[in-house]
Amino acid sequence: FCLVGSEMCIRDSTTAVPFLTISPDSRSGAMGDVGAATSPDVHSIHWNSAKLAFLPSGGSFSISYTPWLSKLVPDISLSHITGYYKLNEISAVAAGMRYFSLGNIQFTNDQGEYLGEYDPNEYVFDLAYSMKLSDNFSAGLVMKYIYSNLTGGIFVEGLQTEAGKSFAVDLGTYYQSKTFEISGYDSQWALGLNISNIGSK
């Protein structure tokens, strides 16, 4: 005699700090938010830090501002600043900050009573290191400090809300082939793997 039972549990999933998934640069945003294996650029800290080791010597920085869902709400935006510096031929460091503003929000309780106003915001600081492990292969690490304050410390049912703070890491690898020729043009192919936002929720 055998009795087999199964149970399925469905629960709503909640994503913490979803602004971390918003593309901070127009190039990757226009390509459908791809970036793990695209050619290296100053925004590689967000998509795959391992690519930083393949950037030219010296350094560069970028500043961007992106209105977010502006046809729905006029004052939500993502601001981003990032830069990198090559330490030598095989390694690079980078740093960046993303600031997400959710505009002005009026808070009410369950009965619709006014509780106050606040400009919710979230930000993340990134610090990255990338190194070539061979002529064609590299690895990278990003350390992040994440801050999210969506309520401004208002009181809900007698309890004061608090900002969320967390640390996270990204791990990435990148392989870039040697240059070869196709129809008279120099070409390369690349593979990239990036595991992002490993940390507490």
Predicted segments, located by residue:
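Subset of outer-membrane beta-barrel
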Residues: 6-7, 11-201
